C-alpha cells in the first residue's frame, strides 16, 4: 500500500549535461537538480540582496513577495512546510499554488504541484529524519507520472540521478524514463533497482517513491497547466 508522504511545487528543468540525455526534461524533488518552492530559508534570510534575487526569480511584485514570504514562514513555523519545501498537507500546497504559481502574470507557468508516496512499510525508515503527519493518507486516484529512487540526507531528498546511478542500473536493467525522467517501470522492477544500488552514492537507504501530478488543472481532468 502506497501512502502520501508530501507535496511539492516544482518546475521541471532541462536534463543536465552530466545525465547524458537521460530524458529531455527532469522532474524530481531533489534540490540538486530542480528547484522546489517556496524556499523557507530564502524567505527568512537577512541578506536583502539574496532575498531580492529570489523575488525576481519568482517574478513577483514586491508586495506579493512580502505576502508570499509571510505565508511561507507561517507554514514553516507551524511545521506544515519542511526545510526542503515539502508541504505536509495537500490543501496548503494547493492554496500556495493557486495564489502564487497558477496563471499568475510574470510567474513561470511551468510549475507543477506533485505528490510523492511510498510503501507504508517503509515509513519507519524516515521517521527520525522528517516531520511526520499525525495521520497518513492513502493515495487517491490521480495522474501517476512515474517512480523516482530517493534517499533523505540531512535536509532534503536526493535522487539516484544526482550520483549518475542510472548508468550502473542501465548495465543490468532496462530503465523506462518517461517525459520527465520519472521511471515507468513496474513496482517490482523499482524494488529491484533500489536493492541494486543500496549503499551506492550515499550511505543511506534508497527507496522507490511514486510521483503523482496534483496540479489543480490536471486534477480536474483537463490538460496539465503550463507549457514547458
PLM region descriptions:
Residues 93-98, 186-195:
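Short amphipathic alpha-helices within nucleic acid-binding modules
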Residues 83-91, 181-188:
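Conserved aromatic
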Residues 2-83, 101-111, 115-120, 130-180, ...:
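Short aromatic-glycine-(Arg/Gly/Cys) micro-motifs in beta-strand/loop hairpins
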Residues 189-228:
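Acidic, proline/glycine-rich low-complexity IDRs
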Amino acid at each position: 500500500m502506497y501512502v502520501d508522504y508530501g507535496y511539492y511545487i516544482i518546475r521541471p528543468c532541462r536534463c543536465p549535461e552530466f545525465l547524458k540525455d537521460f530524458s529531455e526534461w527532469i522532474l524530481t524533488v531533489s534540490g540538486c537538480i530542480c528547484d522546489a518552492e517556496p524556499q523557507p530559508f530564502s524567505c527568512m534570510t537577512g541578506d536583502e540582496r539574496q532575498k531580492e534575487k529570489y523575488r525576481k526569480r519568482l517574478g513577483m511584485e514586491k508586495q506579493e513577495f512580502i505576502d508570499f514570504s509571510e505565508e511561507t514562514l507561517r507554514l514553516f513555523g507551524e511545521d506544515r512546510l519542511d526545510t526542503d519545501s515539502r508541504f505536509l498537507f495537500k490543501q496548503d500546497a494547493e492554496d500556495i499554488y493557486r495564489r502564487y504559481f497558477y496563471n499568475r502574470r510574470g510567474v513561470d507557468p511551468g510549475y507543477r504541484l506533485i505528490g510523492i508516496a511510498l510503501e507504508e512499510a517503509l515509513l519507519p525508515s524516515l521517521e527520525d529524519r522528517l516531520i511526520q503527519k499525525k495521520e497518513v493518507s492513502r493515495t487517491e486516484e490521480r495522474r501517476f507520472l512515474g517512480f523516482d529512487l530517493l534517499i533523505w540526507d540531512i535536509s532534503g531528498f536526493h535522487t539516484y540521478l544526482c550520483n549518475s546511478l542510472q548508468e550502473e542500473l542501465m548495465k543490468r536493467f532496462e530503465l523506462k524514463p518517461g517525459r520527465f525522467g520519472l521511471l515507468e517501470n513496474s513496482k517490482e522492477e523499482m524494488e529491484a533497482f533500489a536493492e541494486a544500488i543500496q549503499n551506492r552514492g550515499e550511505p543511506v537507504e534508497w527507496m522507490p517513491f511514486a510521483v503523482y501530478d496534483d496540479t489543480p488543472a490536471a486534477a480536474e481532468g483537463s490538460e496539465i497547466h503550463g507549457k514547458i
